[in-house]
Amino acid sequence: MYLDSRLAWDALPSPTHGFRSIARMVSGDPQPNTKKLQLVQTLHDVAQNTSLPRGIVIPVYEPIVNLAVSLILELRTMGVDAPVELPHCGDVKIESQELFLQKTALGSIRFYDVCELAAATTVQGNLSTKVFCEDIEACHSKFRSFDIKVIAVVFSKFEEIMMVDADTAFFVSPTLLWGSEKYKETGTLLMNDRIAHEIYFMAERVGGDPSVSYQHRYMSRFDPAPFRSIPTLERPKATLPNPAPVKLKFEPSDFLLNSHSWNLRTGHQVDSSLMFWNKKKQQRATAILASFKALSDVGSPPSYGDKELYFYASELAETQYAFSDHAIGAVGTEYRDYGDHNSTLCGDMAQVFPIRQASEDDVPLFYLNSDRVLHFKPEVEPVYYMKARMANVYPGPFGERRMECPFGITGAIFSPAEANHLAGRQQLHKLTVEWERLTHGSAGDPDTRKTLDRAADGLVDGLMHEMREQYRQVVIPNV
């Protein structure tokens, strides 16, 4: 998700940020007290207050609204007609909202101030006690960051959510994954993050102990008792031993015990640029997710922003959940070709399609996640991406290598179709900027504005028609 440096800093874990508040965590009382149960019930009821079956959520603030709008247009060219929520934290201009709500090419969209809702939420049976923040200013301070994504899940009117970062460009329609076995069985689908920073973030060690991380400590102290009255999708008991020297109060999954983060190979686990979440199927996990950002003693787990919170919530809810079959990839122009499974590519994040295919060569490039989606020019300089690698593969530590440079990989150059599609997305973004320029620049001359606006609408429609025709040629992977 593209954020400026101030907003990104607000979400960083550090001695003065998020996960150092672990000491405030749920104490593990044998019998949850009334206040805890009231809070949990409130979180559950707020999150389950849905009115639409399924939709897309793209959190925004003013500088990235055009990027989000161009993403919606891109998705519409892929046949995606799902409604879209654009939650913000009081930092999107009314003029921007009014402009884009008038554009029929965008389909069904809704802007709303999620921080206003969060600031007004009180505990059931104790209306003087706020749930997320004491007032709107506190909500602005708290949620004008990556954490807006968490409350966007909580307050979404959609039962089934596909959350996407605005700075994402797709090459295959993501809504295919609503039909995947992974999603249908669990109501979740999470993407893997880089295997890096093995002594930082989730993997930062506690008090110099080389065998205990902040993730270990948080999860060992978490008390699931207040949440156990909420339904969950029960999973089988783990068959693997716990490699960490901590005792857990919940039943862990084999996925956790075998994960790269739990085994101290990485400080990251989830790339939340795309995330599927069914609030009705994952009721307990959704309440736990909400509790991470509530004014309570639960505290927020160790994570770079919101990324890992969906994973923590699922694991602590003792529910079934699903991850991509494939490791995170990369996209960039700096490719060192040393042959298959031996090359290096430096660049930004990319994901291949998350469902295993008949062979690695059949797994297509799925999406890019970077504000550089607007700047790559494959027709001028070759752009490469990392081909599929299974998520359970541990390539080894980065050592002196840059985290942005996955190694031991197989790379591929953008195909003409991929290059054309990316160019189309970039042109869609330029046209959304033109929409906004015309609105502000011609305000004093309504007739001229209408003429220019219709012309811009025509350009958008024409480009979208071309992109639809091109997308019909895409080979659709198996789900």
Regions found by a protein language model. Give the residues of each.
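Glycosyltransferase catalytic domains, chiefly GT-A lineage
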Residues: 1-479
